[in-house]
Amino acid sequence: MGDIRTFVFAIEDTETTQGLCKTIGRSSSFDQNSLCKPYNLYFDEPELSRQHAVLCIKTPIPKIEGVPSIEQLRICIRDLNNKTGTVNLVSDGPNDEIDLKNGDAFGLIAIDNHPFRDNHHLAAKLIFRIELEYFDEAREIVKCTITNVTFGKNNTVSSFPIHSATSTEDSDSSWYGLSEASTQTEVADECHETNTILTRGGRFSILSLRKRGSKQDQKICSNFDRKIHETSSFEEEIEVCTDTDTTEEKEEEEEKEEGDDEEGEIELEIIRVKRIKGRTKIKKTLTCFSKNKKIITPQHSNSMWLLLIVILIFDRLLSN
């Protein structure tokens, strides 16, 4: 599935001469009012015109007694492009003004015999389904959902972007009381009313949408993050270790002893043997010690003994 656009409106706003109208067109980054947002009908499609078509929802006058108001709503798509900009997918009627029912689909950007797969052909580059449902039946507030179903039947992901549910863009309430909560583009599991507002179009309810994430998806993400963490730790360990040919050496400890003051600084390369998965690793670090401390290693100790022996021999020779 592709984009999901959602907005709410009051049925009394459809009882005017023109009804409820919403522009369909190409999004533009230069105009804040025509940016691609989850509560409008502007799309990132270069073949669309700036004002490609218009969605009209209207209640016929006079109203029919005994019939629910939502069932009397007339849905119409009018072409503003005059270049086969809209496509009638539900009947053989004209393409420039398409009458729809709740749940019907319509097309944008007509194409001739465009092959898709399995001998199927697309009549339009973009196909949308429109659905109306009560959000608050007592107050006659309706929720309109328009879904991109261009490749839905063929299990092919649409190429159009899906808005993030954590969008930080300011909500535009100029479209008949649209609330910020209704800008969520993903399908919500819960929807309830939190407040009621009044606009120039009438009274409207503020939507509050809640989405429960899939436990399976959360589990997959958790396992993936854990694998990444383990891989990163292993790579860091590889960088500081070098393989050796021995497999049974034990970890050696550095022996540090304090001695007399000595001028200058001593640079000493400390070798740490570390066993990893049955193989011995050696970690090398270059350490710089101050002149106030003296570290004696086995090699240094042997040198001192040799020096002491040489001094004793030299002293014996002098005494003779």
Curated annotation (Swiss-Prot):
Q: Which InterPro entries match?
A: FHA_dom, SMAD_FHA_dom_sf
Pfam families in the record: FHA
Q: What is the lineage of its organism?
A: Eukaryota, Fungi, Dikarya, Ascomycota, Saccharomycotina
Annotated region described as Disordered, given as residue ranges: 242-264
- Tell me what organism the protein belongs to: Saccharomyces cerevisiae (strain ATCC 204508 / S288c)
Protein name as catalogued: Uncharacterized protein YGL081W
Residue intervals passing through the bilayer: none
FHA domain location: 22-86
Signal peptide (from-to): none
